[in-house]
Amino acid sequence: MAYMFFNKYKIPEVVIKNGKKYIYDKVRKKDILFTPEEKVRQQVLTYLIDELKVPEYMIDEETAMSYYKVVSSKRPDILILKKDEKTGEAVPMAVIECKRNNTLIDGVIIEQTLHYAEQLGCNYAMITDGDYVDVAYCELDNKMLVSIKSLPTYEDMLNGIYEEIL
């Protein structure tokens, strides 16, 4: 696990409606209730779009895994999509779980995220609480995990390029 402070990434302005705090999610194109976990998710989205150059239209949030033909009602926080070479459909290639700051990233959270990656056929999995980040490349064919330094750029993810932690 490595330090990666997402606090440097700007989030949309928080607005108050009916006494509750909301933030505009530019990927989902709607106001979302502002929670500590949502703050981390919005910082990660800014990082994905601005730093890793992930196109907004290739990001999915809080979508039931059943949408991707997985028998599950679970909803990963963020999915990064790619075009399937055979069908042309958008399919997940990375799963990201965001937790509120100071959340202990324990075995349960890691197992949950890796289970999502396996079920969805994702080659990349990332977990963060906004301060710490854990990233893995998932070799789906031989069920191996490689700890990597950080999530690669979108282009590198498409090409299976990553930097392993030695």
Name each model-derived stretch.
Residues M1-Y124, D131-L166:
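A short, conserved, highly charged catalytic patch centered on acidic carboxylates
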